[in-house]
C-alpha cells in the first residue's frame, strides 16, 4: 500500500502525520489513529498500513510535535504529563481537516481508533467531533481524568453519538476492572451503542507486536478482525458474518 508522511500546521506548530492509502481511486472511508505513548513509531505505522490493506485511508498525527527533545528522550510515561486535551483535539481535528479536504475521501465515512493513551483520545474525539461515525478504543485508561483544563472524556459521554467497540486485556490495570464497569454502566445508562471485549491472559498494549513483553498474539488475532468487521459495518455498510 502507498504511504507518506505529510506536515500539517496546528496553532503555529508543524506536525508530522503518517498516511497510508488503499488501492483504487475512491472515494474511500477513512480512519484517524490516535497513537500510543511510544509516539509515531513502527507499531502505529503498521496499524495504519493494515487499515489501508482493508480499504481505508488511515492517518496518524504526531501528537507529541510540541515536545522538546529533552521530553522525548526522557521516560515515555512522562510524556503524558505534558499533554493537554485542548491541544490533542486541535491536532486530531487537523488530521480530520486534511481528510475532508481530499476528494478521495468520503467525508460521511470517517472513524477513529487509538491504542493505550490513544484509546482515551478515541473516546475524547467521539465526544467532541460529530464527524466520526464509529470509534474503536484499545485499552484506553484515564477516561475519568482530564489532561489540562476542561471536562473529562467520561463526563462528556452524553455527547457521543456513534457506536463504540472496546478492547481490553483481562490483566490490565489501566483501565482497572472497576473503571471498565463504570464506563460500561455510564454508556448503558446513556443509551450509547457499545461493545466491550475482554481478552483472557492479555495485559496492557497486547496489540503491540514490537513489544514482546506486552504482545499477546492470541488476543490480537481476535481483536483486529473484530475491528475490521466493525469498521466495515459502520463505514462501508458491509454485512458482518454472524
Task: Show where each model-derived region lies.
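Serine-hydrolase catalytic machinery in alpha/beta-hydrolase-like enzymes
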Residues: 5-105, 152-153, 206-211
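Active-site loop/turn elements of alpha/beta-hydrolase fold enzymes
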Residues: 56, 63, 140, 199-201
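Hydrophobic residues in well-ordered beta-strands that form the structural core
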Residues: 59-61, 137, 166, 196
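A short beta-to-alpha transition loop/helix N-cap that caps and shapes the active-site region
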Residues: 67-71, 142-147, 174
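Primarily recognizes the serine-hydrolase "nucleophile elbow" in alpha/beta-hydrolase
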Residues: 94-159
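Short beta-strand/loop motif that positions the catalytic acidic residue
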Residues: 160, 166-168
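Conserved alpha/beta-hydrolase "acid-adjacent" motif
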Residues: 173-182
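C-terminal catalytic histidine-bearing segment of alpha/beta-hydrolase fold enzymes
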Residues: 188-242
Amino acid at each position: 500500500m502507498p504511504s507518506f508522511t505529510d506536515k500539517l500546521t496546528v496553532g503555529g506548530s508543524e506536525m508530522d502525520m503518517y498516511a497510508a492509502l488503499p488501492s483504487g481511486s475512491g472515494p474511500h472511508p477513512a480512519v484517524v489513529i490516535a497513537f500510543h505513548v511510544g509516539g509515531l513509531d513502527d507499531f502505529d505505522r503498521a496499524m495504519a498500513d493494515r487499515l489501508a490493506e482493508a480499504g481505508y485511508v488511515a492517518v496518524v498525527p504526531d501528537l507529541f510535535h510540541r515536545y522538546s527533545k529533552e521530553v522525548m528522550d526522557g521516560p515515555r510515561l512522562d510524556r503524558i504529563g505534558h499533554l493537554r486535551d485542548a491541544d490533542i483535539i486541535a491536532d486530531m481535528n487537523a488530521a480530520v481537516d486534511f481528510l475532508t479536504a481530499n476528494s478521495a475521501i468520503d467525508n460521511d465515512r470517517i472513524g477513529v481508533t487509538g491504542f493505550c493513551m490513544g484509546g482515551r483520545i478515541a473516546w475524547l474525539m467521539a465526544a467532541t467531533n460529530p464527524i466520526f461515525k464509529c470509534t474503536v478504543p484499545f485499552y484506553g485508561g484515564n477516561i475519568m481524568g482530564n489532561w489540562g483544563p476542561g471536562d473529562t472524556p467520561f463526563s462528556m459521554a452524553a455527547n457521543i453519538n456513534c457506536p463504540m467497540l472496546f478492547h481490553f486485556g483481562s490483566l490490565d490495570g489501566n483501565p482497572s476492572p472497576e473503571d471498565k464497569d463504570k464506563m460500561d454502566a455510564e454508556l448503558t445508562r446513556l443509551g450509547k451503542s457499545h461493545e466491550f471485549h475482554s481478552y483472557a491472559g492479555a495485559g496492557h498494549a497486547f496489540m503491540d507486536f514490537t513489544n514482546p513483553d506486552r504482545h499477546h498474539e492470541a488476543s490480537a488475532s481476535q481483536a483486529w478482525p473484530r475491528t475490521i468487521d466493525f469498521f466495515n459495518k459502520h463505514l462501508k455498510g458491509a454485512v458482518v458474518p454472524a
